[in-house]
Amino acid sequence: MLIAYLMEKLEKFTLINKDRSRIKVFEPFEDVSKPSPSIDAMMISYGCVYKRASKPVMKGSRVETIEAARKEYKQLLDEGWKKTSIFRSYL
């Protein structure tokens, strides 16, 4: 239920793995190519953390449907990833 709530709000949020070495950032993706722009997808950016006090190195990003992003979010939580805000000022 928490997953559905977070994704319904469509806000930007960051997950970090157990080793604190990798992050994924989920944020709403607005398709401006359509006549009436709407948010029906999520951009998932991923990167590495080399030092906790430094800016993470973002390796890439991709756009997924909201449903696919929900599945990935749930899978990451099941693997032990945690929601974090420590890199919010860098991203």
Regions inferred by a protein language model and the residue ranges of each:
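Terminus-proximal functional modules
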Residues: M1-Q75, E79, T84-L91
